[in-house]
């Protein structure tokens, strides 16, 4: 089973090109003004064009209202929505039907009990994303450069499709894949030289680290 790789929080043509050339299956644009990775729909639309036919364009939002989402979907024409806030199962279902787009629902993980939150979303969200629970007082639900105990994911049913996120970088991706066998990975701050500033060299290094990890004889989840 091929590994899905999402580079998230892209803001420049150079970073998008590096992600696509490296083999990203998904590229993410963040629409959340409090984030240093925030981008306007118009700017994202210009960058998104390069991904057509090459990667899944993901619009990442945090408890966005219908008006904001209408503008994002109309302008950017994403292939998928990622909901990274406190959206309820009913909200996820509503947005799937409103925009006729698949939805990836993000969850913040710190301890085993946090995984129980996904139960009401099964059969509604198309995919899950597991990120580290943000530090106390943080206004950002993701992109904080911290990881969680990957061993917790061993309790997941084998049929759950998800992306692993939170503190991934070229130095730890092999261990993350070995411990989780994750079907997908999501990286943002791990390929930045400063918050919100993607570094082409770090993106290239990350893809090389993934390739090296994939060459190792471990079994990925079926």
UniProtKB/Swiss-Prot annotation:
Disulfide bonds: none annotated. Keywords: Amino-acid biosynthesis, Aromatic amino acid biosynthesis, Isomerase, Tryptophan biosynthesis. Belongs to the TrpF family. Pathway: Amino-acid biosynthesis; L-tryptophan biosynthesis; L-tryptophan from chorismate: step 3/5. Its EC number is 5.3.1.24. Pfam families: PRAI. GO terms for biological process: L-tryptophan biosynthetic process. This is N-(5'-phosphoribosyl)anthranilate isomerase. The gene is trpF. Coiled coil: none annotated. GO terms for molecular function: phosphoribosylanthranilate isomerase activity. It catalyses: N-(5-phospho-beta-D-ribosyl)anthranilate = 1-(2-carboxyphenylamino)-1-deoxy-D-ribulose 5-phosphate.
